[in-house]
Amino acid sequence: MFQDHPLLIQLKQQLYDKELRMVGVVKSTDKGFGFLEVNAQKSYFIPPLFMKKVMHGDKISAVLRIVNNRAIAEPETLIEPFLSRFVGKVQIKNDKLALLPKHPLIKEIIPASQPRSMKNTQLCHGDWVIAEMCHHPLDGYRYFYAKITELITTKDDNFAHWRVTLAHYNLEREAPAMPKYLTIQDNGLIREDLTELNFITIDHASTEDIDDALHVAYGTNGALVLTIAIADPTAWIIAGSQLDCIARDRAFTNYLPGFNIPMLPRMLSEDLCSLRAYEKRPALVCQVTMQHDGTLNEDMRFFAAWIESKAKLSYDEVSDWIENIGFWQPQNNAIAEQIRMLHIVCQARSSWRKQHALVFKDKPDYRFILEENGNVKNIIAEPRRIAKRMIEEAMITANICAARVLRDNLGFGLYNTHNGFDTTLIDQVVAILQKHNISVDATQLLTLEGFCALRRKLNTMSTSYLDSRIRRFQTLSELKTEPGPHFGLGLEVYATWTSPIRKYSDMMNHRLLKALIGAGKAERPKTDITFRMSERRRQNRIAERDVEDWLYASFLKNQVGSHIRYSAEIIDIYRNGMRIRLLDNGAIAFIPALLIHNIRDELICNQDIGIVQIQGKERYRQGDTIEVYIKEVHIDNRSIIAKIV
């Protein structure tokens, strides 16, 4: 009868106001208790009983109480749940349905229900699903509760981890459907007939979505005329159509080890648009003359054409032939001549870029060899051999040409830009360089010319230490709608258009280039497409890293205790240890401080200068190569622990 009395309400409010409350994020442990992390320096203990009301990652408000002279946090209000939409593994016990969320720090089994819309889907223990959290104890419910919304895959799927990872990051798991009655929509565009030319393609032997074909011929005074034909999906896909919107949303083909999800329907990406051997295909073509020293003439020309590749070649075959290894031979003299001339183009353009732009140091690609059941058979390092460099030089040439044409004729497009060093950090760069006897001017370093000069100097050094130290002061590359320099490549302007089957921004540049030759109207891209491309690239890379880390951990698990030696590069130094990359297979591992030197007081891991000291003497530095073996592997969180030999 007194519960609504104003004095009683006032008294309750006064008591409430006296209690100290903190807002933070719940961090769980495998011991049952947890912590309320308020900031990087402050956290409060959450007893096991109270942890039953919350989940790792929840943002909550908690009351602080003193129990046995210790401050503890009692969860009170849910501000933001960690789980809303989530991926879970089906658990069935005593005919009751529950889910185990896909997260290494969440061990709670969450009761769940299957909606009527899935009544015909028989779920089994171990299947994977998408679910939404419906009930949370801090919202007044007795326990957590979730509703299943979609079956991802069954427990017997050998590639379940790939599909589950894609679902976890809310990425597509299947190729788009091919629309019925889709035909080429050239709308009066005249295509030149180049089907008699000996175009060749060079790619991985297993590649089906072939974007580019190349032809080289002699011009006047011994110059070489390079003709770069790029697949033309915009011949099939009208801007603003349903298929175009799907491609725009996906932004990229998503490549995972042994598994890819295309941006376009496979009928287009791997057949009708793919520049397959002996098949007549529509293409957008760039033709440019190259002088003996690799200089490009200003005669670059873009046009639409029909082409027919005369040979599908693989990187390994072509590299072996050029290097006089093995027994493979081109099918005829015409194909052999194309390879020879393309090799000449590569050497000249590479030499020109070393002198006038920048060339990245060759680093191997790492390829996972998977068995049919998805298990890792092996992981191999593939050096960037000559055939791959030949294609790269041709594509860079094509992109330089496109960037110049779009800049000079439109003033807009989708440009790949990189601004070099962060202007706010340039003084730190200068200080580091001067400490290593490299005299530089801050203003000059912020110019394209000055940046390139420094990069060339660093490339001549015997170690990568200094290069590694200053890379963290560089800005990230960006996609922009207006032309700008790409410091990383050492170029005044750069715009990609050579992968339209697998990258939507390249499709957009196709349309702009085609508008310049009379096909359609050139419309300035909206800036939101740059944000979409950047965000989707980030999501795809996270998913790729997730799958790769899991495969690495699964593969190296069997190496624990074997003392097999690996060469490794130190890529980062932290206060608590070193991060390394195994050079044989590309795996990232960590060496904790106690495995570097067992007397902690004698060890200094200096993150600021990238050096490890033992007893006051330098022992390791960033960029060094060391010998290690695998000490521990934890599959749940994909961590690989190594120890120095």
UniProtKB/Swiss-Prot annotation:
Keyword Hydrolase tagged: yes
Keywords, sorted A to Z: Cytoplasm, Exonuclease, Hydrolase, Nuclease, RNA-binding
EC number: 3.1.13.1
Location of the RNB domain: 191-517
Entry GO terms, CC: cytosol
UniProt domain S1 motif: residue ranges: 563-645
Major place of residence: cytoplasm
Coiled-coil zones: none
Reaction catalysis annotation: Exonucleolytic cleavage in the 3'- to 5'-direction to yield nucleoside 5'-phosphates
SUPFAM superfamilies named among the record's database cross-references: Nucleic acid-binding proteins (SSF50249)
Cited Pfam families: OB_RNB, RNB, S1
Record-level Gene Ontology MF annotations: exoribonuclease II activity; RNA binding
Subcellular location per the Swiss-Prot or TrEMBL entry: Cytoplasm
GO biological-process terms attached to the record: mRNA catabolic process
Matching InterPro entries: CSD, NA-bd_OB-fold, RNase_B_OB_dom, RNase_II, RNase_II/R, RNase_II/R_CS, RNase_II/RNase_R, RNR_Ribonuclease
Organism superkingdom: Bacteria
SMART domains reported in the protein's UniProt record: CSP, RNB
Primary role: Involved in mRNA degradation. Hydrolyzes single-stranded polyribonucleotides processively in the 3' to 5' direction.
Family the UniProt entry places it in: Belongs to the RNR ribonuclease family. RNase II subfamily.
Database matches in HAMAP family: RNase_II
Official protein name in the record: Exoribonuclease 2
Organism: Baumannia cicadellinicola subsp. Homalodisca coagulata
Designated gene of the protein: rnb
